[in-house]
Amino acid sequence: MRVSTLVLSTSIIPIATALNISPFHNIEKKDILADAASAAGGAAAAVTSGAVGAANTVASGAAGAADTATSGAAGIANTVASGAAGAADTATSGAAGAAKTATSGAAGAADTATSGAVGAAKTATSGAAGAAKTATSGAAGAASGAETAAGAAASGAETAAAGQETSGAGSLVGGSGSSNSTSPSGGSGSSNGTSSGSGSGSGAGVGSGSGSGSGSRGSITGNSVATGASSGPAGLGISSSISQSTTRQLQTSGSSNSSSSAGMGNVVVGMNAVALAALVLI
């Protein structure tokens, strides 16, 4: 048993040596492997660190480029926005200026139209006032003409009346009519005449006259006074009357014609004279 164990042990050592599986050799091999593993780990760590650093560098560069691009895009956007805002402000200012110009032009046109309308209204008012004055003047002229015609007619009427009065006065002065005849009450006068007297007797007088005249307008005043006195033998009842008449005419131009007939008066006077002579003879 011991021999077999020894033989086995003796035979294992050379085999283990040949196979490099001795315990000492394993320790060394382990150190080498550890060193190799450490070296590989260091290299891997270095590669990893380098890769991480490169990745970080790339990421940083990409981030920086992205930031730069973002900043550039933001700047461009801000520039575009500012330009658009400036263009909008310019357009707004231009539109406001155009609107103000249009408003000013419209206001000026409205003022011009208003002034024209006011001028036309004033012209129409002046024309209407002138036409009214002309019509008033024409009406006044027509009224004046009517007054002139009325004055002429009145003047003609007054002139005719003056002719009639003159004719009556002529008949009185001529001795025809009641003014120059004998009557129981004395003498009588016409044309605003008064008479006074007393006496007795009988007599008749007839007088007629006509007058016509024309002339300018004037005023006519006339006074006729007749006074009578009776005389004759007392108790005979015969009297004669004498009358006096005066007529005054002022500011009257015209012509008149008068005629009188006193035949009957003269006949009566003659009869009275015959009767008186007969009584004297008796």
UniProtKB/Swiss-Prot annotation:
GO terms for cellular component: plasma membrane; side of membrane. It is found in: Cell membrane. Residues 163-264 are annotated as: Disordered. This is Predicted GPI-anchored protein 23. Probable cell surface protein involved in the process of adhesion and early events of invasion. GO terms for biological process: cell adhesion. Coiled coil: none annotated. Induction: Up-regulated when cells are growing in an adherent manner and upon milbemycins A3 oxim derivative (A3Ox) treatment. Expression is also regulated by CYR1, RIM101 and SSN6. A lipid is attached at S259 (GPI-anchor amidated serine). It comes from Candida albicans (strain SC5314 / ATCC MYA-2876). Glycans are attached at N180, N192, N257.
